[in-house]
A protein has these predicted regions:
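Phosphate/diphosphate-binding loops
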Residues: 424, 433-435, 441, 480-502, ...
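Extended redox/cofactor-interaction regions of prokaryotic respiratory oxidoreductases
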Residues: 1, 107, 116-118, 122, ...
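Long, contiguous, secondary-structure-rich segments that constitute the structural scaffold
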Residues: 344, 492-555, 606, 613-615, ...
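Flexible, glycine/charged-enriched surface loops at secondary-structure junctions
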Residues: 197-201, 232-239, 409, 507-514
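Short, well-ordered loop/turn and helix-capping segments at boundaries between secondary-structure elements
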Residues: 147, 191, 226-233, 400-404, ...
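Long, well-ordered, tryptophan-enriched scaffold segments
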Residues: 1-196
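A glycine-rich phosphate-binding loop feature that marks nucleotide/adenosyl-phosphate handling sites
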Residues: 188-189, 205-207, 237-248, 511-525, ...
Length: 874
């Protein structure tokens, strides 16, 4: 909150208006040294001027001992006393009106708030000094909330002012929560936090994540708990109880999962962007960024979300695979033919081809036959029956089969080639996939549509590890019986595939060089690649293309394809090297554990690349390796794992692992008794001496910085795109009005006077159990034998709907069929269609589409939000 930011003067309608700008950096003060563009500034009461405290992200890379939250100046080490608000400085302060975006009046609009400001001498890029208006984040936050500080602006007259943004009376019209109830809860929450030292908590489920504006909603909750001093306190803060897996032994799991014990980096893709393009949701995009931005920010980012994603991939913020319009093996071969001998020369040759346009990015033409996915393998996942939004898009574009898709192509992006179209002769000629393989324990919807189904071992037929965000223990899975018939464990299935692949690779591939492009990842030096939050596109000439800084990383990886099976079946040598194991920017060597695993698991005796290395014969061996390499399950590794963080912070921290140094969780040990995970630098909780995990204790109590730009939790985000969308502060943004932008209209969507237009919500599956899901007799009886659609009794009566009637729900994305469940408990204007209602049992024909009646995701499609694409910036 004390950090300083510029107020930018902007001309609007013939008037000069102040708008919150980017944060002030050490470089703005003319200071040099290590990463001054990444060190943030406060106003120090003692020196009566600006200062640069420890803990900013600039101190994390390139120096030692100042990446900590001691309130000292990182240049002269003097103690600091930060000014929270310039209003504290009395007569030395001016008051100005600044404009803030609000989003609850239909179109985004602006309101003014009074902020106290000071004039700061700033050194420009040309070396000349100029005066700029600055204020604190606290003052900006207060002004944005319409708090009347006696200096004018669009302020609230009191809690009962329903016209003013963020008052209790204002929210009542949106949420239905009476203003007096909201005031009571807020006061009790804050009072309890004050009395207990921060032990007030906000608990939420998965619902927030299903909304387009989930990020600002989360930020609002985090801001509330931070203002009340609840972070880093046992029993305080915020927590989401969803049932997601939290991989506590993270470093060991990552090593085995991505094969970093042998080589790297891996290719990892964010699922939302992948499906947005693979399912051609972008061709039917109805959202306009200009319509979502405040009036003063029109044109500050691409209007089409697909153009935003393409720019993010180009600048290295997000991955995009396939990478190029040619095989990445061919990229290295072409470089070699052009005379490139070393890996560095191959990268340089590739970079020149990218600059000239000779080598095209796949994201620039995602429907070109050279750029589409061809093979997909699913295991422990049911994308078509559960989690992938855009079920009918999946059927139409990826599989090329019949679907109930009812949409039309919308406006197209500017920077992405829309040709060839998928159905054209030059396109893929129908579905993009040549092969879809699913490994499953049951005949799920995904299996029904797959080319090959591999029967997998069931829950009680294999070895595995389990750890969740809801308890601190690491649990084992042990087989009660062998897999039935032809079923195999997932580990054994991939082992068999690796064996056959290696056999074929010896004939057809050999050892090849692969050009791997990877995004600028969080917790790596790439996160300080693009200073000031400015969007500088190398293709447009804004900057030189520099891998790892202004664009994605490029690295040549040698692939010994004939040895894949041997590498799969043994633990590679990298884990014994310095920094060979790690996660979240912290790494260490596991040389002692490497030798211990040889004794525990045995060594490979067969000649070849893996000879003499620890064996991985089965899933249990893989679990043993994960436990051995992770500080959360091996106390000796835990003590060692703090060394890198101790250098960065200048603090002694390994005392947090000393009490468990002689403890090593083994698979046999946790089978006898599941055990709590240990404290580690990969997580922010402290779990020594019987303490229960609470996030951010390491940051608040031991002064290890948060992994953010300033090293603190942020109320204000100053990236150009965050300001462009009006989301620098945790503002209220209403749900997207999908009806208003056209999701229930179009030439293929019939409308009648009896139609009900309802807001569709998809709560967690109601009639299912995780071991056998919903398609068994007991669960089917509970759910009336098929899909169900819950709706309000008054809504049902208005359309002549009786309980248990078959209903047809539809929009541009597709059709879902289900029985009406009429209940007064459902809010007016809403419908509940529980998730994971599969199209396997009792799915009738849809009169509208002529196909079977879909799943809950038949009514959805993938959406992408630009604020969640930002990278290279902390």
């Amino acid at each position: 909150l004390p950090f300083l930011l510029f107020l930018d003067e902007e001309e609007r309608d013939g008037e000069t208006v102040l708008a919150p700008g980017r944060c002030v950096r050490a470089s703005d003060l003319g200071l040099g040294g290590n990463n001054p563009e990444w060190k943030f500034v406060i106003h120090d009461r003692t020196r009566k001027g600006p200062a640069v405290p420890n803990g900013s992200i600039g101190s994390r890379y390139g120096e030692e001992g100042t990446w900590n939250l001691e309130m000292r100046d990182c240049y002269d080490r003097a103690d600091l006393d930060p000014v929270l608000s310039y209003a504290e400085l009395g007569d030395e302060t001016e008051w100005k009106l600044a404009a803030f975006p609000v989003f609850f009046e239909g179109q985004p609009s602006l309101r003014k708030g009074a902020v106290p400001v000071r004039r700061l001498a700033v050194t420009g890029a040309d070396g000349k000094q100029q005066e700029r208006l600055v204020t604190t984040v606290f003052d900006i936050l207060a002004a944005s909330l319409a708090i009347d500080r006696g200096h004018g602006g669009d302020v609230a007259s009191g809690y009962e002012d329903a016209r003013a943004y963020a008052t209790p009376a204002w929210q009542e019209a949106i949420t239905g929560v009476p203003a007096e109830d909201m005031i009571r809860v807020a006061r009790e929450f804050a009072d309890n936090a004050e009395r207990t030292g921060g032990r007030s908590m906000i608990i939420m489920g998965a619902g927030v994540n299903h909304w387009y504006n989930n990020d600002v909603t989360y930020r609002a909750m985090i801001s509330l708990t931070t203002l009340c001093g609840c972070q880093g306190v046992s029993g305080g803060g915020w927590a989401h109880y969803v049932g997601q897996e939290k991989v506590r032994p993270l470093a060991g799991w990552t090593t085995v999962t991505v094969g970093s014990d042998w080589m790297g980096p891996p290719r990892l893709h964010n699922g939302t962007s992948f499906y947005y393009f693979a399912l051609d949701s972008w061709r039917h995009e109805l959202l306009s960024m200009d319509k979502l931005t405040p009036p003063d920010r029109k044109g500050s980012l691409p209007d089409h979300p697909a153009d935003c994603n393409a720019l993010a991939a180009r600048l290295g913020w997000l991955p995009f695979y396939p990478q190029f319009k040619e095989n990445s093996l061919e990229t290295c071969e072409k470089a070699a033919k052009a005379g490139a001998a070393s890996n560095e020369e191959i990268v340089a040759h590739t970079l020149e081809r990218l600059k000239s346009g000779d080598l095209e990015l796949s994201v620039d033409a995602p429907d070109d036959p050279a750029n589409v996915p061809r093979v997909m393998v699913f295991w422990r996942a049911n994308p078509l029956g559960s989690n992938v939004k855009g079920h009918e898009y999946f059927l139409k574009y990826l599989l090329g089969t019949e679907s109930s898709f009812l949409g039309e192509e919308a406006r197209q992006p500017e920077t992405i080639r829309t040709t060839p179209e998928p159905d054209s002769p030059e396109g893929v000629g129908g579905g993009k996939l040549d092969l879809m393989v699913t490994s499953e324990i049951r005949m799920s919807t995904t299996c029904v549509y797959s080319d090959i189904v591999l029967p997998a071992a069931h829950w009680y037929e294999y070895h595995d590890l389990s750890s969740t965000d809801m308890h601190p223990f690491i649990h084992p899975f042990n087989p009660a019986t062998d897999p039935a018939w032809e079923a195999r464990t997932n580990w054994d299935q991939f082992k068999a595939i690796a064996q056959k692949f290696s056999e074929l690779a010896g004939k057809h591939l050999g050892v090849r060089k692969d050009m791997v492009a990877t995004a600028l990842l969080h917790d790596t030096p790439g996160e300080i690649g693009q200073p000031f939050g400015e969007v500088r596109d190398w293709r447009r000439g804004d900057a030189e293309p520099v891998p790892g800084k202004t664009m994605f990383n490029l690295k040549v990886v040698e692939r010994p394809y004939p040895d894949i099976y041997k590498m799969y079946s043994a633990l590679g040598p990298n884990v014994a090297k310095p920094g060979g194991v790690g996660a979240k920017g912290v790494s260490w060597s596991c040389a002692p554990e490497y030798e211990q695993l040889k004794a525990r698991l045995g060594v490979v005796s067969e000649p070849g690349v893996s000879e003499g290395m620890p064996r991985i014969d089965n899933a249990k061996d893989a679990c043993e390796i994960m436990l051995a390499l992770s500080p959360e399950s091996n106390g000796d590794v835990g003590v060692r794992s703090w060394a890198g963080l101790e250098k960065q912070t200048g603090f002694k921290l390994n005392d947090l692992s000393r009490p468990v140094q002689d403890q090593h969780l083994t698979f046999e040990g946790i089978t006898a008794r599941p055990t709590k995970g240990f404290t580690s630098p990969n997580w922010s909780g402290i779990e020594v001496h019987g303490r229960t995990y609470a996030p951010f204790e390491l940051n608040v109590q031991r002064l290890v910085p948060f992994h953010t730009l300033t090293g603190r939790q942020h109320f204000y985000m100053d990236h150009e795109w965050m300001r462009g969308l009006g989301e620098s502060l945790p503002v209220y943004r209403p749900p997207l009005s999908l009806a208003a932008i056209g999701e229930i209209s179009g030439p293929r969507i019939p409308r009648t006077d009896k139609d009900l237009v309802l807001n569709f919500l998809s709560p967690h599956s109601k009639w299912s159990i995780h071991s056998s899901y919903s398609d068994n007799h007991i669960m089917r009886e509970l759910s009336r034998g098929g899909g169900e659609i819950w709706l309000n009794n008054d809504d049902a009566a208005s359309a002549g709907i009786a309980d248990n009637d078959w209903l047809e729900c539809f929009n541009a994305n597709g059709v879902f069929m289900g029985r009406a469940v009429v209940s007064h408990r459902i809010p007016h204007g809403k419908t509940y269609i529980h998730h994971a209602q599969e199209r396997t049992v009792n799915v009738p024909l849809s009169p509208l589409s002529g196909t079977r009646g879909g799943t809950h995701n038949s009514l959805t499609r993938p959406l992408v939000k630009p604020t969640q694409m930002i990278g290279g910036y902390g």
